[in-house]
Amino acid sequence: MRSGRYIGVMSGTSLDGVDVVLAAIDEHTVAQQASYCHPIPQDIKMAILGMCQGQAVTLSALGQLDTRLGILFAEAVLTLLKETELRAQDITAIGCHGQTVWHEPTGDAPCTLQIGDNNRVAALTGITTVGDFRRRDLAYGGQGAPLVPSFHHALLLHPVERRIVLNIGGIANLSLLVPGAPVRGYDTGPGNMLLDAWIWRHCAQPYDKDAMWAMSGQVNPLLLRRMLTDPYFALRAPKSTGREYFNLSWLERMLAGLPPMAPQDVQATLVELTAMSIAEQVLLVGGCERLLVCGGGARNPLIMTRLSALLPGIEVSTTDECGVSGDDMEALAFAWLASRTLSGLSGNLPSVTGASQETVLGAIYPVNAD
């Protein structure tokens, strides 16, 4: 593997910021050295949300958003370099996931689209950039997601302990790590996505800090049962999903015809949906000794409490307790995937995505030679 300093850039479905992380990576270790979260301007955030929820968009608007996101990602990297007093020459490459605006891995013409022009990232930072990680897996019949389980396996596999790494971002996904067995992983369903969208609509807050609003409400069993009957939860793996499926339009369909309820009760019920849909999948794959949680949902005390209650006998903790920052996990993963791409090594796991073979992921955007 090509060792060096790498920067990972991740803008996830939760849209809570652009996560940028600096790590020293070699064949055996991934050592995080610095991190930074760059704000996403509100107009860009709203444009992304509109596209993800199927609003009509012109090619001009899509192209301009692609450019603006590329510039934004470059600004995030340059800010991290300034904070760490490093130069572009000190960095081997950037692994830039991009912003998913559509993910449709099934049907006659499976597709996934991450925007944020990597040409701009490379040009503005002066650093070789690796991006467009998902579509090669799709080309081999895979879901294109999740890709992070290969990183979980490299970093958090235990010699004897059966573990599940659970990432709760906008969407929740799990990685089953069993010594001596192939990795399994998939998207379980909504993580923070519906929670954030609902509190933004009713309270104009980007997220429910410490789950205070949800804890002021009561779970509505009728709504919960209706949501849990959604066909996605019964699908067999490999499977993946996103904001184009689980969004406020989906929630409004679930609420249709039910007696009126307080918005905080809906919020409480959405927390229970996230916790129950995760817990059911944890049990479906045979459980584990330790559930390691990362992503923004790891900071939601109500989700963590409910997971512990729904999974008795399983130790529920965070990846931070294993020395890996839960907030930076995905950005770290794409820094690591960039190192594998530059080394000509595969980055996907067919046992997770359903692809017909392992493959090198992504496209490389080199900088001009001096």
From Swiss-Prot:
Q: Which gene encodes it?
A: anmK
List the PANTHER family hit by this protein, alphabetically: ANHYDRO-N-ACETYLMURAMIC ACID KINASE
One Pfam family matching this protein: AnmK
The entry's ATP-binding residues are G12, T13, S14, L15, D16, G17, V18, D19
The EC number of this protein is 2.7.1.170
Q: Which GO terms describe its molecular function?
A: ATP binding; kinase activity; phosphotransferase activity, alcohol group as acceptor
**Reactions accelerated catalytically:** 1,6-anhydro-N-acetyl-beta-muramate + ATP + H2O = N-acetyl-D-muramate 6-phosphate + ADP + H(+)
Q: Which family does it belong to?
A: Belongs to the anhydro-N-acetylmuramic acid kinase family.
Task of the protein: Catalyzes the specific phosphorylation of 1,6-anhydro-N-acetylmuramic acid (anhMurNAc) with the simultaneous cleavage of the 1,6-anhydro ring, generating MurNAc-6-P. Is required for the utilization of anhMurNAc either imported from the medium or derived from its own cell wall murein, and thus plays a role in cell wall recycling.
UniProt record, GO biological process: 1,6-anhydro-N-acetyl-beta-muramic acid catabolic process; amino sugar metabolic process; peptidoglycan turnover
Q: Does the keyword Translocase apply?
A: no
Task: Give the matching SUPFAM superfamilies.
Answer: Actin-like ATPase domain
Chain segments annotated as coiled-coil in the UniProt record = none
Q: Which domain of life is it from?
A: Bacteria
Q: Which HAMAP family match?
A: AnhMurNAc_kinase (MF_01270)
Q: Per its record, how is this protein called by name?
A: Anhydro-N-acetylmuramic acid kinase
Arranged from A to Z, the UniProt key words for this protein are: ATP-binding, Carbohydrate metabolism, Kinase, Nucleotide-binding, Transferase
Record's CDD domains? Answer: ASKHA_NBD_ANMK
Look up and give the organism this protein is from: Pectobacterium carotovorum subsp. carotovorum (strain PC1)
Associated pathway: Amino-sugar metabolism; 1,6-anhydro-N-acetylmuramate degradation; Cell wall biogenesis; peptidoglycan recycling
Keyword Transcription regulation appears in the UniProt entry:
no
